[in-house]
Swiss-Prot record:
Active-site residues (renumbered): E289, H310, K424
Keyword terms of this UniProt record: Cytoplasm, Gluconeogenesis, Glycolysis, Isomerase
Example GO molecular function: glucose-6-phosphate isomerase activity
Cytoplasm listed as a keyword: yes
Origin organism lineage: Bacteria, Pseudomonadati, Spirochaetota, Spirochaetia, Leptospirales
UniProt-annotated location(s): Cytoplasm
Family: Belongs to the GPI family.
Pathway noted in the entry: Carbohydrate biosynthesis; gluconeogenesis; Carbohydrate degradation; glycolysis; D-glyceraldehyde 3-phosphate and glycerone phosphate from D-glucose: step 2/4
Name under which the protein is recorded: Glucose-6-phosphate isomerase
Function: Catalyzes the reversible isomerization of glucose-6-phosphate to fructose-6-phosphate.
Length: 450
């Protein structure tokens, strides 16, 4: 049985049992659609069996590449955008301590990121920073022509060639790309870069359990075996457990779709642990790209409490009643702090003396759950015993499966993203890319230029 638990105690006032049961029936039908591969986008269901079907040999090859990176590099620059980097970053930042010592810095490779936006200042400073550092690059792109990572990789490759010489960089660049085709694959073959394969049947936002996510995670010093073990446990549970028997993914999908039908059109991912910052970013891409189409979809947002209680808390409590929350709870911190008594008690906090800081955080969480429920915001709770590779593997696979089920319940293809092309086509036209001349004329005319 998985470590993950779900409670709907603060949802029940909004979603009656008969409505929930109907949604659970729909969720079970969607689960069967995922498992039998009969739904829209079924050519991208390779992620479903990844944890159980990934070979030990494949994990070993990834670990060997990670060890090579660790042997000669202080930094690994992960070049990718969207699902090509968010899964890895979610796991790495969830597991990396906020404050490192000189000793821990020597033991691990620091992960940097590029190609996830087009800001000139960021990339200029990154290149300047790397001038006198030992570094490697993991470039991740199925095609090799996605604009943001392609630009970043061109800049980094130029620096690598100047710094080490073209003939000496074949063990400093690792390409995660298509098995046999595409610009990046051809470039990797030309330079003899080591390559890892992005499976044809796995889309970017579902790729964290492929080399896309696993190589950076391993290079950062974390156990990809434990991550996959957690995912494998969740895979087994979600595939073998029917909705009526307590399938966690069906329960989550049923609740969010039931609330959506009642006008709750925005779901807020809430965490009380700053380390979940990029888990929430990964979650937003997963659900936003999977469900936001055909005029449908729950809008995914995120907040970090208690910090955002002092910014977004007012809106959540008293604003438009279109919100639902999913709160990620962690039962046990890795370390804790005890509050002590002070003689003069001039800050009025002696009533907390002897309590752990985690107790204060848990009380803030419970108090907020009650307040938001009373204010008209249904709150679902997802609980993990702790933050480690295994529990993160469970959580991420749970969300992937839930997203597929929820998308099918919504009646959309959870595995395409046609709307993403619109901005690209306009950008290409404005930049003068060949073949976009007519669109450029249309854009300039629309803007009032002749």
């Amino acid at each position: 049985m998985s470590n993950l638990k779900i409670s709907d105690r603060f949802v029940k006032p909004f979603l009656d049992q008969s409505k929930l049961e109907k949604e659970l029936e729909r969720a079970e039908m969607a689960r069967q659609t995922v498992l039998n591969g009969s739904g829209l986008g079924n050519e991208f269901l390779g992620w479903v069996n990844l944890p159980s079907q990934t070979k030990a040999e494949d994990l070993q090859n990834i670990r060997k590449a990670a060890e090579l990176i660790q042997s000669h590099s202080q930094y690994l620059v992960v070049v990718g955008i969207g699902g090509s980097y968010l899964g890895a970053r979610a796991v790495i930042e969830a597991l990396t301590p906020e404050f490192s010592t000189p000793e821990t810095q020597k033991k691990t490779v620091k992960i940097l990121y590029a190609g996830h936006h087009l800001d000139a200042d960021y990339h200029f400073r990154l290149l300047a920073f790397l001038e006198n550092k030992e570094f490697s690059v993991n470039v991740i792109s199925k095609s090799g022509t996605t604009t943001e990572p392609a630009i970043a990789f061109r800049l980094l490759l130029s620096l690598l060639e100047r710094k080490y010489g073209k003939e000496n960089i074949k063990h400093r660049v690792f390409a995660t790309t298509d098995r046999s085709k595409g610009a990046l694959k051809h470039l990797a073959d030309e330079y003899k870069f080591p390559t890892f394969v992005i499976p044809d049947d796995v889309g970017g936002r579902y790729s964290v359990f492929t080399p896309v996510g696993l190589l950076p995670i391993a290079a950062a010093g974390f156990s990809i075996n434990k991550l996959m073990d957690g995912a494998k446990q969740m895979e087994s549970e979600l595939k073998s457990t029917a909705s009526k028997d307590g399938n966690l993914a069906c329960f989550y999908a049923a609740i969010r779709n039931g609330l959506y039908s009642l006008g709750k059109t925005t779901e807020i991912f809430v965490s009380y642990n700053p380390s979940f910052g990029y888990v929430s970013e990964w979650w937003k891409q997963l659900f936003g790209e999977s469900e936001g189409k055909n005029g449908k979809g729950i809008f995914p947002a995120s907040v970090q409490f208690t910090t955002d209680l002092h910014s977004m808390g007012q809106y959540i409590q008293d604003g438009e009643r279109k919100l639902m929350e999913t709160v990620i709870k962690v039962e046990a911190p890795k370390q804790d702090v005890y509050l002590t008594e002070k003689t003069d008690d001039n800050d009025g906090l002696n009533y907390l003396a002897g309590k752990k800081l985690s107790e204060v955080n848990q009380s803030a969480m419970l108090g907020t759950l009650i307040a938001h429920k009373d204010g008209g915001v249904p709150c679902l709770e997802i609980t993990l015993p702790s933050i480690n590779e295994e529990t993160l593997g469970e959580l991420l696979y749970f969300y992937e499966f839930s997203c597929a089920v929820s998308g099918y319940m919504l009646g959309v293809n959870p595995f395409d993203q046609p709307g993403v092309e619109d901005y690209k086509n306009n950008m290409f036209a404005l930049l003068g890319k060949k073949g976009y001349e007519k669109r450029k004329e249309e854009i300039l005319s629309h803007l009032g230029f002749s």
